[in-house]
């Protein structure tokens, strides 16, 4: 039953991506991106719905051409979550998705083209209340910056970002957020640290092209964890070569670890050893699969023996300590004994019961507040 995060977040300007606040005092938003063919409207809508079910706050969709722009409009009509259109090179695509109700434009002013084209995009965004994300990436730095620095560096990423920020400043447009991504953890972290000191706009965090499910999760947890622990970051996206739903799960796990967001079960489990009185690994795998639908923030401890079990169980909403028999704790107090027979079924029932009680209590607090 862990408390609020001790992290003091960086002060930033609040913007709105659809109905989701970003920056200021808003919760850190979890974002993902579709990896379907945008022209396949049904497949893209289905994937977005899976992301929504996983708890995503904002979804980015690649819009590489005008056909995709028209498909984007159809997708937008069929989903409720805010959508970001990822636009490069052709400013007319940005203008079209603005007409079709996009919630945010992800552009790089440097590759949109002439000043008049950037102005046209900014004017369309301003007229419709659409924010912009300036997305700087180590893999696509401007040629003059590559020549100046010799290779991507934190300073190069920040100079690129500030160049685009100044571009929007000249057009008197402040409704934007910024990202400075790199696949190298140290480069990305230092770039965000430098940028955070120089602008007030929200920062979208990510380690780009982080890798597959395991390696990408580790890189993202290390990099984003460092920044978030320093109070830097207003939205996050975990870039994984995997099912985008995994990006959302990992994102929430990172935020839960830092007590920055609470959603669903926060499991505390031992790695198990020969002292375990039940199969901890099997029990955890079954519980995680069965309880994915629970949204109520709940701490659940699953400890295989009495060495650390009672201590961890007393700190959880629901705790299981291995023994002969096993002992269940509810809100830190011993509640009942369980044998290994039907252990997972009984534990699931108790967790769901506690989740329902907590949801009711939380709702009552909101009403009284």
From Swiss-Prot:
EC annotation from Swiss-Prot or TrEMBL: 1.17.7.3
SUPFAM superfamilies the record matches: Inosine monophosphate dehydrogenase (IMPDH), Nitrite and sulphite reductase 4Fe-4S domain-like
GO MF annotations, alphabetized: 4 iron, 4 sulfur cluster binding; 4-hydroxy-3-methylbut-2-en-1-yl diphosphate synthase activity (ferredoxin); 4-hydroxy-3-methylbut-2-enyl-diphosphate synthase activity (flavodoxin); iron ion binding
Record keywords, A-Z: 4Fe-4S, Iron, Iron-sulfur, Isoprene biosynthesis, Metal-binding, Oxidoreductase
Gene3D superfamilies: Dihydropteroate synthase-like, Sulfite Reductase Hemoprotein, domain 1
Cofactor(s) it depends on: [4Fe-4S] cluster
Family that this chain belongs to: Belongs to the IspG family.
Protein name per UniProt: 4-hydroxy-3-methylbut-2-en-1-yl diphosphate synthase (flavodoxin)
Gene coding for it: ispG
């Amino acid at each position: 039953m862990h408390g609020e995060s001790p992290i003091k977040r960086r002060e930033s300007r609040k913007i709105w991506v659809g109905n989701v606040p970003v920056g200021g005092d808003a919760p850190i938003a979890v974002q993902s991106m579709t990896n379907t063919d945008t022209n396949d409207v049904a497949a893209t809508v289905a994937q977005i719905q899976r992301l929504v079910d996983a708890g995503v706050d904002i979804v980015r969709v690649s819009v590489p051409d005008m056909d995709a722009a028209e498909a984007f409009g159809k997708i937008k009509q069929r989903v409720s979550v805010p959508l970001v259109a990822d636009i490069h090179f052709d400013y007319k695509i940005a203008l079209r998705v603005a007409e079709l109700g996009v919630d945010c434009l992800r552009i790089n002013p440097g590759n949109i083209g002439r000043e008049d084209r950037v102005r046209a995009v900014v004017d369309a965004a301003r007229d419709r209340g659409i924010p912009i994300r300036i997305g700087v990436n180590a893999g696509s730095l401007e040629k003059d910056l590559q020549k100046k620095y010799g290779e991507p560096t934190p300073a190069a990423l920040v100079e690129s970002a500030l160049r685009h920020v100044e571009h929007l400043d000249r057009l008197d447009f402040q409704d934007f957020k910024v990202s400075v991504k790199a696949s190298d953890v140290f480069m990305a972290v230092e770039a965000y640290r430098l940028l955070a000191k120089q602008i007030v706009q929200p920062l979208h965090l990510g380690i780009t092209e982080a890798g597959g499910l395991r390696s990408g999760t580790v890189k993202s947890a290390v990099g984003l964890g460092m920044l978030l622990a320093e109070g830097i970051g207003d939205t996050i996206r975990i870039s994984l070569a995997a099912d985008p739903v995994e990006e959302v799960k990992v994102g929430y796990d990172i935020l839960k670890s830092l007590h920055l967001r609470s959603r669903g079960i926060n499991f505390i489990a031992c790695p198990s050893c020969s002292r375990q009185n039940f199969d901890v690994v099997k029990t955890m795998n079954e519980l995680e699969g069965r309880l994915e639908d629970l949204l109520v923030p709940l701490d659940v401890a699953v400890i295989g023996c009495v060495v650390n079990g009672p201590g961890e169980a007393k700190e959880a909403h629901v705790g299981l300590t291995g023994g002969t028999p096993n002992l269940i704790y509810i809100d830190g107090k011993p509640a009942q004994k369980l044998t290994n027979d039907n252990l997972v079924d009984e534990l699931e029932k108790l967790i769901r019961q506690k989740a329902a009680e907590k949801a009711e209590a939380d709702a009552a607090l909101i009403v009284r507040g």
